[in-house]
Amino acid sequence: MSKAVKDIDPNAEIFGPALFGYGAFTNFADAPDWKEIKNDNPEYKWFIDYYLDEMKKAEDENGRRLLDVLDVHFYTEAKGTCGKRYCEHYGDPDCVYNKLNSTRSFWDDTYTEDSWITDAGAEFLPILPALKESIDTYYPGTKLAITEYDFQG
């Protein structure tokens, strides 16, 4: 698709893949073929690495950049003090604080969110430095966009 767009407008910026959250970043939402790809390519720490590397290979084959912006979505998985992920206690200062504090999952390596992500290891939190590292390793020059997010704040 990006080749067709670039054929019509070489200056168009192509965004992709618009992954929906942490599970999609790490293992493409448990796609069955991802396990085989990962086993055959242990250098890929997560799906983002594989995607960027494949886009770089496609650029090399086509002689032009086919992905301009790595596009991801991120939604907090952090729980409020009530223990719920989508806490609706908007009048409870502690729940509101936890929701607003969860934005730190983007950038703060001293922050540990209370969620299934940290229970599973949180290898790629904070998310922005992890994404930037993958870009720098597999497809330098790619921009980054978080085009959808929700922190329930």
Map each language-model feature to its residues.
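Noncatalytic carbohydrate-binding groove/subsite architecture in carbohydrate-active enzymes
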Residues: 1-153
